[in-house]
Amino acid sequence: MRILICDDDTLIIEQLQKYIESYFESNHLKCPELVSFTSGESLLAEKSEKDIVFLDIEMPGMNGIYVGNELKKANKNVIIFV
């Protein structure tokens, strides 16, 4: 499983990664691969598997709503948090 985080604020990315890692650790689960992006364009250019995606709504260039819609077109099973 891969969890992707897309936010133009790297501090938000770091904090969300810590929360996710802490959740898996506290539940004695193997943490999945965490991948971060600072733009919607770079996330959409990534062709690898996308299981769960956390998106920032307001980003320069492509906003999170647009990116989420594009992800759903490519994979209707992707889970998206905005």
Task: State the predicted function of each range.
Residues N77-V82:
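A short, hydrophobic beta-strand element within the central beta-sheet of small alpha/beta folds
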Residues D7, D56-I57:
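Active-site residues of response regulator receiver
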Residues T10-V35:
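Two-component/phosphorelay signaling modules centered on CheY-like receiver
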Residues L34-I52:
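Acidic, metal-coordinating helix/loop segments flanking the phosphotransfer/catalytic sites
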Residues S39, N63-V67:
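Acidic catalytic/metal-coordinating carboxylates
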Residues P60:
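The feature encodes the CheY-like receiver
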